[in-house]
């Protein structure tokens, strides 16, 4: 499924509804990893609303954010302007877009890779590699099979706040995860408007990821669980690879 329409309604609410995700610690973990490499120009693939893009800019990196959702990029640009943490933003699909070979590093954080259909993963990684200079570093994560099958499958998640109510109905069939999102947005007159959208993610095992990386010309540097935890028990797996 093409996820271009995902986040059409959720874009302006996403960071607000995920304000308890530990973004500060998460971004610092990635930045600390980056400090091991002599890099300054980065590409944030699947940047969404730009939270991590802005965190990298704040740290002194020159950033470009890429996303398939126009609504998410609108939000990212708005927040970039408000914060003074300026970045370039590009609308595009990483499995199709051809970018200039100018970046020292690329990131893909918070399920970006899970949104890529299995038939497009190799093309996506090859396009990341093509955008990196020799020796460029690729840092990204995936939500793990354990998370999807043991914690997400056949569940409903909800968040009820004064101005927005969020419901997400999750189903897993094979390696495909469907998330049907319903939002109830409060209006100025006190009424609510319902909005619906569908997200589809894909479950990847470490072996699939490593094979796609090697096929794209990367060498695997590190694989570990979120924030360095045991990957066999982690809900999120973090990868570091380097372009040969």
Question: Which role does the model predict for each range below?
Answer:
Residues 1-37, 39-48:
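Conserved class I S-adenosyl-L-methionine
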Residues 51-96:
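Class I SAM-dependent methyltransferase SAM/SAH-binding core
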Residues 98-105:
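A short acidic, Gly/Pro-enriched loop at the edge of an enzyme's catalytic core
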Residues 109-111:
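Residues lining the SAM
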Residues 119, 139-208:
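SAM-dependent methyltransferase
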Residues 122-134:
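A short glycine-rich, Lys/Arg-flanked "PGG" loop and its adjoining helix->strand segment in the class I
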Residues 206-244:
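C-terminal lobe and adjacent flexible extensions of AdoMet/dcAdoMet transferase-like proteins
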